[in-house]
Amino acid sequence: DISNFIEAAKTFHVLGIKITKDGDLINEWYSEPECRRNIYSATKSFTSCAVGFAVQEGLLSLDEKLTDAFPEDLPDVIDDNLKMATVRDLLTMCLGQERGSLMGEQRPLYQEDDWVKLSLAIPFQYKPGTHFVYNNVGPYLAGILVQRRSGCDLVSYLTPRLFEHLGIKRPTWETDPLGNSFGAGGLFL
């Protein structure tokens, strides 16, 4: 019986407890079983998984140039660093942009609804792969590419491939102004 342990855990605002032994579930308890929690930037790990599945399924390549992946979304003037950027660079935080964009406090301030075009229009100051900058642009664009190639949002794409296998039921995902899953954050599990 774990009731005393649960009562003690409640005083620390523990959200859930799972007890396993030799790989078998012995007991579990959740403070709010149907409540979803925002996992914020840990969302990026799930977007990376989506990219991995898409690569495995032949929907995209890590070496694909962004100029080939997003031909309709490119700025009028394409600098040399953007021409070199690949899907792989989207996942490494070394995209080549000088500062982080699409960050939480910035998103409500954007006048532009098309964040793909906005993201690609931000100058690529550095050669991709040479400067680390924590940035939501890479994971966001990676998620967009998976959605475009798979024909569905990230929840629909990841549910049969990952979420069902992990026992994650009914995840939700924040979207950009055009309704695309925001691959850099806002996944609720």
Language-model segment annotations:
Residues 42-48, 84, 134-139, 187:
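Short alpha-helical patches at coil-to-helix transitions and adjacent helical residues
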Residues 2-33:
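A short, well-structured edge-of-sheet supersecondary motif
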Residues 23, 38-63, 90, 142-146:
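Active-site SXXK
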Residues 57-97, 121, 150-185:
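Active-site helix/loop module of the DD-peptidase/beta-lactamase fold
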Residues 94, 102-110, 115-139, 143-175:
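Active-site cradle of extracellular carbohydrate-active enzymes
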Residues 35, 39, 78-80, 127-134, ...:
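Solvent-exposed loop and edge beta-strand segments that line ligand/cofactor-binding
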Residues 10-11, 81-85, 110-112, 125:
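Extracellular/periplasmic catalytic domains that process cell-envelope and extracellular macromolecules
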Residues 25-35, 120-128:
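Glycine/charged-rich beta-loop-alpha catalytic/anionic-binding loops adjacent to active sites
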